[in-house]
Amino acid sequence: MSTPLSLFVTGTDTEIGKTFVSAALLHGFARHGLRAAAMKPVAAGAYERDGVWRNEDADQLDAAASVVLPPELRTPFLLKAPAAPHIVAAHEHVTLDIDTIVACHRDALTRADIVVVEGVGGFRVPLNDTQDTADLAVALGLPVVLVVGMRLGCISHALLTADAIAARGLTLAGWVANHVDPAMTYADENVATIRDWLAREHRAPLLGRIAHMAPADPESAAATLDIAALVDTLRAAQR
């Protein structure tokens, strides 16, 4: 039996399509014949339905996953207010504990062939007074997929984030160009610049370009991603 695969999805910023790309990856992995599950370990922003608190990002991941995890595994920390997690957690008297997330991830790996773990915000978002989401990625020990929101300023954000990932000793398995701004000028040139720099400095391939979609359609977006290459990279990282 093959060892389960997993990856950590981060982004250059918040609101750049991490959940959308994570959902596209889930669809792609399912088409590749893998039982794919998703985790959103920390989610800030909840709504109540039928007496149950839910999160829109987590709902989107569940809709795309071929293996739906129990809510307590998928999102061990669901915060009500849509703001910086460590601030909301303090107000809601919640301790965001990395060890708890690692334990949930270990359980999730027993239920699927691949687990997509979506971070919160950018790569370094505080979880408490001493730890951030980069520490979470290190604790999980996962290869990272970087979602770059293609808009003005994205080149610097992409290069800085890639450097931060490498500085933590993590593998940048690849990146996705997500065109969040349909009016962006020189989009092709921006993608080419990021592609060349990340390939040269981090050997990180461009996994795909996703055109601006309104409404977002992760199932269609999955067709633009090089899932086979990503799976090969993830398997190589296990050796």
Curated annotation (Swiss-Prot):
Pathway per the UniProt entry: Cofactor biosynthesis; biotin biosynthesis; biotin from 7,8-diaminononanoate: step 1/2
Species lineage: Bacteria, Pseudomonadati, Pseudomonadota, Betaproteobacteria, Burkholderiales
Protein name: ATP-dependent dethiobiotin synthetase BioD
Subcellular location: Cytoplasm
Binding residues for Mg(2+): 19, 57, 118
Keyword Transcription applies: no
Catalysed reaction, written as an equation: (7R,8S)-7,8-diammoniononanoate + CO2 + ATP = (4R,5S)-dethiobiotin + ADP + phosphate + 3 H(+)
Xref: SUPFAM superfamilies: P-loop containing nucleoside triphosphate hydrolases (SSF52540)
CDD domains: DTBS (cd03109)
A GO CC term assigned to this protein in UniProt: cytosol
Summary of subunit composition and partner proteins: Homodimer.
